[in-house]
Amino acid sequence: MRLLQLLFRASPATLLLVLCLQLGANKAQDNTRKIIIKNFDIPKSVRPNDEVTAVLAVQTELKECMVVKTYLISSVPLQGAFNYKYTACLCDDNPKTFYWDFYANRTVQIAAVIDVIQELGICPDDAAVIPIKNNRFYTTEILEVE
């Protein structure tokens, strides 16, 4: 019985070791990679029928490449190259920047959408992954027409 009590009694050194291991495990869990990092840039305001350039910069922290399709959606129809859809291979060492030129004659809300898709012939050797958790990312901006 006494031997059993000695086995189950924790020494201060053991408790300190367990605490350090627990703190180290929590720090490791916080170090997750971001699937998509996006920066959508459009002017805040323009005059009616001025040409607008929208810029979407996309990158990833994943070690594997992904096939992404990017496009814009608006609250009202717009003229120009607004409806262009881009498909590209996105890797951590090769961020992508996409451009759209269009005309706006009234205030509009614009969403830049990034879909992670499965498509052959885009990434080298067709080596690409699709995230399980999320495969659609977006950001919105308002373009004021004065």
From Swiss-Prot:
Subunit details: Monomer. Interacts with AZGP1.
Cellular component, GO, one term: nucleus
Protein name: Prolactin-inducible protein homolog
Keyword check for Manganese: no
BP terms from Gene Ontology: detection of chemical stimulus involved in sensory perception of bitter taste; negative regulation of T cell apoptotic process; positive regulation of gene expression; proteolysis; regulation of immune system process
InterPro entries membership: Ig-like_fold, Ig_E-set, PIP
Organism expressing this protein natively: Gorilla gorilla gorilla
Pyrrolidone carboxylic acid, modified sites: Q29
Glycosylation sites: N105
Compartments where located: Secreted
Signal peptide: 1-28
Annotated disulfide bonds: C65-C91, C89-C123
GO molecular function, one term: IgG binding
Keywords from the UniProt entry: Disulfide bond, Glycoprotein, Pyrrolidone carboxylic acid, Secreted, Signal
Family: Belongs to the PIP family.
